[in-house]
Amino acid sequence: MISLDYGKYKNARNASWQCILDFNVNKLPVIVTDIIKKSENIRLFKDSDVHMLEEGESGKTILHNGFFEIVYRDTEPSYRCRFTISHELGHIFLGHLLINTPVYRTFAIRDDLESSANVFARDLLAPACVLHELQATTAEQIAKICNISMQAAKHRAERMHVLEARNKYYLHPLERRVREQFDSFIKENKQ
């Protein structure tokens, strides 16, 4: 896997925070379809309806007639669909798309664009500051609270271990605002 330099990582992380704020996400698990419903130029399609995905693709995004169209493989488990949709939102919000050039989500592609979209999806679905406040740092806790796969939760738990050891939360103003936006949820669900 190609490592993602820190600048690109921060850009993806910050974009996920901005998405959380812009679309008023304030509880876990994040309902990614609500983000799409609130957006003016993003449409969501099930592959079982449009048959656009190739073998091995979990999702893709194309720009068509001024709309970003996300197609996802709806036969996969719901937590996988949510990650795929979030990943595709990452491509959109990070500006990865060119006119009429699709971006695909597969298991094989591991370049910087895909890594950035994965960071965006991870940070959207499992925001570290919220997990920190909930004291949810194990893969099991994260998978349950965030409705993500155990594989994704393990990756998040590994990153949480690093973040907890560093203990540098709330240095960025966007992160502080995300924490404030989740305040009621945190109070209701603190371990």
Where are these regions (language model features)?
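Active-site hotspot residues in diverse enzymes, especially metal/ion-binding acidic/histidine motifs
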Residues: 1-191
